[in-house]
Amino acid sequence: MNITATVLLAFGMSMDAFAASIGKGAPLHKPKFSEALRTGLIFGAVETLTPLIGWGMGMLASRFVLEWNHWIAFVLLIFLGGRMIIEGFRGADDEDEEPRRRHGFWLLVTTAIATSLDAMAVGVGLAFLQVNIIATALAIGCATLIMSTLGMMVGRFIGSIIGKKAEILGGLVLIGIGVQILWTHFHG
């Protein structure tokens, strides 16, 4: 695979994480760049590991991974999105709550895993091609780091416009990503 294809693949794989990061950044009041970078690093690290895991599994269980990855991502994203919506409605009455909390490490890791299962499936496919899997995985991780950090910062501006309802919007974004993953699987 040439460098152009690798870069296109990397940024293509980072789009779900970008959208999820917008959703994560929206409910936070004025997140610092360090918070956005923390999110980007977590998403980037997970997105680097999943194609490597998928590549390793390619020889062992490619049929299972390809048959179930969309369902796993769908369930995780519906759960996380639903949780954000519920928290958004609970917090909607308390308009003076300042500042909004940071997202917990494990919540970010779970979201990153849910949005990177497609990268694991890509890793399975890459096992059957002549590619440098380390370079490809690092490219995917770096693109995801950049796009997730950017997504958090974009989400911050959306959140400042719509206020506390941003958590509901973020939950809807995650659910939308889950539905899109399932739709793409069944409708190509």
UniProtKB/Swiss-Prot annotation:
Instruction: Report the subcellular localization.
Output: Cell inner membrane
Key words of the record:
Cell inner membrane, Cell membrane, Ion transport, Manganese, Membrane, Transmembrane, Transmembrane helix, Transport
Database matches in InterPro entries: Mntp/YtaF, Put_MntP
Q: What is its main location?
A: membrane
Recorded GO terms, molecular function? manganese ion transmembrane transporter activity
Transmembrane stretches in the record are 3-23, 66-86, 106-128, 143-163, 168-188
Q: Give the source's domain of life in one word.
A: Bacteria
Q: What cellular-component terms does GO give this entry? A: plasma membrane
Membrane topology category: Multi-pass membrane protein
Q: Which family does it belong to?
A: Belongs to the MntP (TC 9.B.29) family.
Its biological purpose is as follows:
Probably functions as a manganese efflux pump.
Which protein, by its recorded name, is this? Answer: Probable manganese efflux pump MntP
Lineage of this protein's species? Bacteria, Pseudomonadati, Pseudomonadota, Gammaproteobacteria, Enterobacterales
Give the gene that encodes this protein. Answer: mntP
